[in-house]
């Protein structure tokens, strides 16, 4: 496709877009997806919203303070002025952001985009080696870092020639202090709608980082598809949740969606599930985004009544078990909104809400997207047949200078790496990540199906299922199981769980290997690390 003339002086991003023949098809079928050629998403989400709703409207809450839209705009503009005039940031240059979810991280995000820069957001948990790899990949020239997380970045910045500025310390060298005397107005760079706004980092099975390139129009597109038609945010909503803003799930649910409708967002740096429920109750939050693990933990802790003000609860990051959906509905009346998205697609593209929800199904294609289940040759399979999930819409995968682009974009579709089946009504039913399908003695076994069966047992708190190599069968089903407190972890319990599973699903799917563990390996954001379970003793 032909791109609009770029406003970027530094053309690194556009120069390293995938070749056109490796792009999936793009579609802008909805009227709300028709954007002008010149578009800066920061201007639309902040300046335009302020003009419509007023400067005094609350924009950002934290446990200690609230910023209005006017305060956020003034501070973002001061930062943008400093980045342009003192740091010398040029349109198109990459700026790495490092910090937890708080108002100043949001101000930095807006400032970079207003100045025409490209945001490379990172979670504070990344260590020096990971930061080095990402900086080398994206050629970032500036880093804005919460002072509490500067240690791992300081040496990396010096070694890579990155200009590093810290915020939040309050001293004379602090970015906030340095920008405090700058003008509170700024003339935003008039970027092209298809200029790169974000480089969203993700990692493959090899661990080598990838960066997906998303345009300014893509940022608005996720709000005008999933945000508008499924989340259905309102100006009086208070959004909150746990995903980092560096993750596209968090970026959409905690920044783009609320700002698109003039709502406010409650930012939490860290929270256990119980603390999350308490915070929801304290602030009267109405839209919640978090992982299935957190919803399950809230239920297990008996904290679900604290979610009384929630009218929309989004679950993403991993498959939502039907049992969790049902328990939440039975105890609170909340219908969890399941969805599947990806960093490559920027956000959720299959989901359902309200009466359209079918518990256990991920949903149907979000308005603006088209989804299908394909075979290995890229041909649609009959309904009810498992195959590769494929999607097209207004966003797509564009890896930064990465040969793995050809694996994700095939036959005009984005191939997500998930195994699904579609029913006759167009609902998509998750089977497994493609690499979570277990082939044992010629049988295809979906790990999540075995997990759901095991979790029906009253002694099982949670579990995870993976393939383990086996000389006779090729692979066997292995389950790492967390038992409820006080339940003995002994061979008798193994046999009991195996027999129980055979009663729930086809006997050939039962876990031939069961390992009791105190906890499942997860990232700091709660996402299960299945790869750590695939090697013996890795779970414990």
Residue ranges of each PLM-predicted region?
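AMP-binding/adenylate-forming catalytic core of the ANL superfamily
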Residues: 126, 143-145, 288, 390-393, ...
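Conserved AMP-binding/adenylate-forming
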Residues: 65, 82-129, 244, 444
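AMP-dependent adenylate-forming
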Residues: 43-68, 166
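Conserved AMP-binding A3 loop
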Residues: 68-70, 190, 197-224
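Conserved pre-ATP/AMP-binding loop-to-beta segment of ANL
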Residues: 171, 182-201, 208, 231-238
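Conserved ATP/PPi-binding loop(s) of AMP-dependent carboxylate-activating enzymes
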Residues: 364-368, 379-411, 425, 443-445
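Conserved AMP-binding/adenylation subdomain of ANL enzymes
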Residues: 220-238, 245-287, 301
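Gly/Ser/Thr-rich phosphate-binding loop
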Residues: 285-290, 299-358, 370
């Amino acid at each position: 496709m032909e791109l609009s003339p770029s406003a970027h002086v530094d053309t690194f991003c556009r120069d390293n877009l995938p070749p056109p023949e490796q792009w999936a098809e793009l579609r802008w079928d909805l009227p709300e997806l028709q954007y002008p050629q010149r578009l800066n998403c920061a201007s639309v989400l902040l300046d335009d919203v302020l003009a419509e709703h007023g400067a005094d409207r609350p924009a950002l809450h934290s446990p200690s303070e609230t910023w209005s839209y006017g305060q956020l705009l003034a501070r973002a503009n001061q930062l943008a002025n400093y980045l342009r005039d003192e740091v010398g940031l040029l349109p198109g240059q990459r700026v790495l952001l490092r910090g937890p979810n708080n108002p100043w991280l949001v101000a930095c995000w807006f400032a970079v985009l207003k100045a025409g820069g490209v945001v490379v957001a990172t979670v504070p948990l990344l260590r020096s080696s990971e930061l080095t790899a990402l900086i080398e990949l994206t050629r970032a020239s500036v880093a804005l870092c919460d002072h509490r997380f500067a240690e791992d970045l300081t040496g990396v910045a010096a070694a890579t020639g990155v200009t590093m500025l810290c915020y939040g310390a309050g001293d004379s060298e602090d970015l906030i202090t340095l920008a405090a005397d700058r003008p509170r107005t700024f003339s935003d760079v008039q970027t092209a709608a298809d200029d790169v706004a974000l480089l969203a980092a993700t990692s493959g099975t090899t661990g080598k980082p990838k960066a997906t390139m998303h345009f300014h129009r893509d940022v608005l597109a996720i709000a005008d598809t999933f945000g508008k038609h499924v989340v259905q945010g309102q100006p009086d909503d208070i959004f909150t949740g746990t995903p980092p803003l560096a993750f596209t799930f968090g970026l959409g649910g905690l920044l783009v969606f609320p700002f698109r409708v003039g709502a406010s967002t409650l930012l939490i740096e860290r929270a256990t599930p119980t603390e999350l429920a308490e915070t929801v109750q304290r602030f009267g939050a109405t839209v919640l985004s978090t992982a299935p693990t957190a919803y399950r933990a809230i239920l297990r802790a008996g904290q679900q009544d604290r979610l009384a003000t929630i009218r929309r609860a989004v679950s993403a990051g991993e498959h939502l078990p039907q049992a969790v959906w049902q328990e939440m509905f039975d105890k609170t009346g909340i219908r969890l909104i399941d969805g599947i998205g990806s960093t490559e697609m920027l956000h959720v593209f299959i989901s359902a809400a309200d009466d359209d929800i079918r518990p256990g199904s991920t949903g149907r294609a979000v308005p603006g997207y088209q989804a299908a289940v394909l075979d290995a040759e890229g041909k649609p399979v009959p309904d009810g047949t498992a195959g590769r999930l494929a999607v097209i819409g207004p966003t797509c995968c564009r890896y930064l200078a990465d040969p793995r682009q050809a694996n994700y974009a095939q036959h005009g579709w984005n191939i997500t790496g998930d195994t699904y089946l579609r029913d006759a009504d167009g609902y998509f039913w998750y089977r497994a990540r493609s690499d979570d399908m277990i082939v044992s003695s010629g049988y295809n076994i979906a790990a999540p199906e075995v997990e759901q069966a095991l979790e029906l047992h009253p002694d099982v708190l949670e579990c995870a299922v993976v393939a383990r190599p086996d000389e006779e069968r090729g692979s066997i089903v292995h389950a790492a199981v967390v038992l409820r407190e006080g339940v003995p972890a002994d061979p008798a319990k193994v046999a009991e769980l195996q027999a129980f599973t055979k009663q729930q699903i086809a006997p050939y799917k039962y876990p031939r290997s069961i390992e009791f563990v105190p906890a499942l390996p997860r990232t700091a954001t709660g996402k299960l690390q299945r790869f750590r379970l695939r090697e013996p003793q890795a779970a414990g």
